[in-house]
C-alpha cells in the first residue's frame, strides 16, 4: 500500500492565516474558516429547503464548504486585493488553484479520488450548490468583520463595506434570513448572548 500525504497536507490548514494584511484582534486560519463556512452553508441549505422550497442536500453542501479552501495548503491565502487586482491576475490565480486542487486529488489513493473529487475540484458542484457555498464564504468573512469591529478594530471597516456590496450581489432569501436571524449576535458580548 502506497503512503499518502493528503491528510498531512490538510492538517496544515491550521497554519495558513487569513486576513494576512490586516491587523486583527483575533487571528483566523483557513481550518477555522472552513469549519465555519461548512456550518453556515449547511444552515443556508436547510433554510432554503424549509422556508423557500429548496431541494438541496445540506450534508453534501456542508462538505463542499468544509473543503472549499483546501487548495490553499499548496498556494497559501492570497489577499483578496491582490487576487482580484485585475482580471488577468484573477484568471492566472484560478489556474494556480486548479493545479493545486489536482495535485491534492492526486495524493489520494486511486480508489478514493472519485469520492473526493466533487469536494476538492472547483466547478464540479452544480451552480446552486456553488452559490450556497459562495454565500456562506462571504457571510463568514462579513461575520469576521463584525467581530473585529465590535472589538474596536476599525481596520475592518472598509472590508465590511466591500463585503456588504458582495452580499448584496449574491442576495438570496435564505441569505437574508440567515443575516437577519443570526448575524446581529456577532456584534454582542458573551454576557449579552448568554
Curated annotation (Swiss-Prot):
- Which organism does this sequence originate in? Vibrio atlanticus (strain LGP32) (Vibrio splendidus (strain Mel32))
Name the record gives this protein: 5'-deoxynucleotidase VS_2195
Q: Which reaction does it catalyse?
A: a 2'-deoxyribonucleoside 5'-phosphate + H2O = a 2'-deoxyribonucleoside + phosphate
Q: What does this protein do?
A: Catalyzes the strictly specific dephosphorylation of 2'-deoxyribonucleoside 5'-monophosphates.
Q: Which residues bind substrate?
A: 18-19, 33, 69, 77-80, 137
The protein's matches in HAMAP family, at most eight in alphabetical order, are given as: 5DNU
Q: EC number(s) for this protein?
A: 3.1.3.89
UniProt cross-references to CDD domains, sorted A to Z: HDc
Which PANTHER family does the record match to this protein? 5'-DEOXYNUCLEOTIDASE HDDC2
Check the record and name the Pfam families matching this protein: YfbR-like
Q: Which InterPro entries match?
A: HD/PDEase_dom, HD_domain, YfbR, YfbR/HDDC2
Q: What is the lineage of its organism?
A: Bacteria, Pseudomonadati, Pseudomonadota, Gammaproteobacteria, Vibrionales
What does this protein need as cofactor? a divalent metal cation
Q: Which domain of life is it from?
A: Bacteria
Amino acid at each position: 500500500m502506497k503512503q499518502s500525504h493528503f491528510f498531512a497536507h490538510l492538517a496544515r490548514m491550521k497554519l495558513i492565516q487569513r486576513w494576512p494584511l490586516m491587523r486583527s484582534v483575533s487571528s483566523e486560519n483557513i481550518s477555522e474558516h472552513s469549519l465555519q463556512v461548512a456550518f453556515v452553508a449547511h444552515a443556508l441549505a436547510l433554510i432554503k429547503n424549509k422556508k423557500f422550497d429548496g431541494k438541496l442536500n445540506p450534508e453534501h453542501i456542508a462538505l463542499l464548504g468544509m473543503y472549499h479552501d483546501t487548495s490553499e495548503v499548496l498556494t497559501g491565502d492570497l489577499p483578496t486585493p491582490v487576487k482580484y487586482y485585475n482580471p488577468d491576475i484573477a484568471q492566472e490565480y484560478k489556474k494556480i488553484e486548479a493545479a493545486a486542487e489536482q495535485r491534492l486529488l492526486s495524493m489520494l489513493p486511486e480508489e478514493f479520488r472519485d469520492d473526493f473529487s466533487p469536494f476538492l475540484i472547483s466547478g464540479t458542484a452544480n451552480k446552486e450548490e456553488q452559490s450556497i457555498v459562495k454565500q456562506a464564504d462571504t457571510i463568514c468573512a462579513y461575520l469576521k468583520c463584525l467581530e473585529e469591529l465590535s472589538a474596536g478594530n476599525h481596520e475592518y471597516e472598509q472590508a465590511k463595506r466591500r463585503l456588504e456590496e458582495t452580499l448584496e450581489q449574491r442576495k438570496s432569501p435564505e441569505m437574508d434570513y440567515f443575516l437577519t436571524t443570526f448575524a446581529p449576535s456577532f456584534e454582542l458580548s458573551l454576557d449579552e448572548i448568554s
